Regions:
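Polytopic alpha-helical membrane-helix bundles and their juxtamembrane interface segments
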Residues: 2-221
Length: 221
């Protein structure tokens, strides 16, 4: 009963923080947006710990990287901070993919499934990169390409796990797809279209949903 109450309380806190953050994005309230952004991952990590029977240090490490990435991306228009944010999220994705890989491998996926799941998200990431490559600073082009492929591998690993019947893989796949959507919107906003409140809301709505679904999926696994 205490566990249920804790999950309920943390869910309510995460929803409240998320709603406040999205409202701040939509209204252009920068101080409130920055403050609430740094609350999101600690709340999601706490919710994961409350839901999981045995929380994985690998998943918690990935969530910490997400929190660090959130901090750096507040200042995304400074090239050094953008690079640091990509590095933090990239490391987080490596940890996420590693943990999903363990779940997927245990379910013994078929080779064809693994190949198909790898090619489709990878093609999406490559398309986004080649559309934007001339607008991306030269120093960030290779890291950006590698980051996109790493992000695609998150969805690939989750799909492999889903087809193989791994527990929680449906949530992980949905989270991986939303992560790709979020970062795709962010890439266009940063390198082509310029900032807008609507784009900020879209980026953060899909990002929050992605991280929450990953937390639920990992807790189920």
């Amino acid at each position: 009963m205490r566990e249920v109450n804790m999950v309920t309380a943390l869910t309510a806190a995460a929803v409240a923080a998320s709603a406040t953050h999205l409202a701040a994005c939509g209204l252009g309230l920068q101080k409130l947006r920055r403050g609430t952004k740094l609350l999101l991952m600690p709340l999601i990590a706490a919710l994961y710990c409350a839901m999981a029977r045995s929380p994985s240090p690998v998943v918690l490490g990935a969530m910490f990287c997400g929190w660090a990435g959130d901090f750096f991306m507040i200042y995304k228009h400074r090239e050094a901070f953008l690079g640091a944010g990509m590095a933090a999220f990239g490391l987080g994705h490596i940890l996420y993919v590693a943990h999903i890989g363990v779940l997927a491998a245990a379910a013994q996926p078929r080779l064809f499934t693994a190949l198909a799941a790898t090619l489709v998200p990878g093609a999406v990431a490559l398309c986004i990169f080649f559309v934007l490559r001339r607008r991306i600073p030269k120093a960030l082009r290779l890291p950006g390409l590698l980051y996109g492929l790493l992000l695609a591998s998150l969805g690939s690993a989750a799909f492999i796990g889903l087809r193989a019947g791994a527990p929680g893989a449906g949530f992980l796949l949905a989270g991986g797809c939303l992560f790709l959507c979020s970062d795709g919107i962010l890439a266009f906003e940063t390198f082509r279209d310029g900032d807008s409140n609507a784009a900020d809301v879209a980026v953060m709505l899909t990002y929050i949903a992605a991280q929450a679904l990953l937390a639920v999926g990992f807790a189920a696994g």
